[in-house]
Amino acid sequence: MVVYTVVFIPPELKEDTYQPQPVRQHPIPKRDKPGEYRMLGIPAIYDRVCQQALLNRLEPIFEPIFDDASFGYRRGRSTKDALRKVWKEIQSGSEWIVDADLRDFFGSVDHEKLLTLVAQRVADGRVLRLIEAMLKAGSYGKGQLFPSERGTPQGGVVSPTLSNILLTPFDREMRLRGYQLTRYADDCVPRAQRQRNRLLECVTT
């Protein structure tokens, strides 16, 4: 059986005239922190279509360079795969383990740094302008419009891949320093056989 994939390219993307709408804020309770909320940014339906077209362009370029430590939002990888990797490395002799969560990662993404990393592998200025427009589209909630000078919306189609692009240098740096690492989006588990203090310092700087 032959399976065909139909890809719709919005005309505004071809003409370089597309301007995304602000995302809709949608708070959801944090499971492990009663009374605290995680703010999702839900794009309009048409913007989701445009983000999917962008994702289809970015994935083949960046997927081959993502580190083996990364498991979040990647085809063929799951939380179970990440847990199996952690367990295998624990059994191999890791004495020190840190369960780390990158605080407010999606809300604090540096746009300039992210665009610089994308530009290292994407020369098409239209793609770079599109990403910047999505990042700076802003958000709205409770009748107010909020600018977005930092961050990428949790809830956006392309945000997970952008997060992996931004964190790939971190994955590589941990490996170069001799630490084992498993990362799922902004949650990471670095491990080492010795030097507990240096491991903690490496994660927090």
Regions found by a protein language model. Name each.
Residues 17-18, 46-47, 57, 61:
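Short, solvent-exposed loop/edge-beta patches enriched in aromatic
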Residues 8-11, 29-32:
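Intrinsically disordered, low-complexity linear regions
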Residues 51-69:
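Electropositive, glycine- and tryptophan-enriched low-complexity nucleic-acid-binding patches
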Residues 19-22, 31-34, 45-46:
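A short catalytic or substrate-binding loop motif that flags glycine-/basic-rich loops and adjacent residues
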Residues 1-7:
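Hydrophobic alpha-helical membrane-insertion signals
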Residues 34-43, 51:
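Glycine-rich active-site/cofactor-binding loop and its immediate structural neighborhood
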Residues 12-27, 65-69, 73-77, 81-205:
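Conserved polymerase palm-domain catalytic core
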Residues 45-46, 50-53, 87:
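Duplex nucleic acid-engaging cores and interfaces of nucleic-acid transaction enzymes
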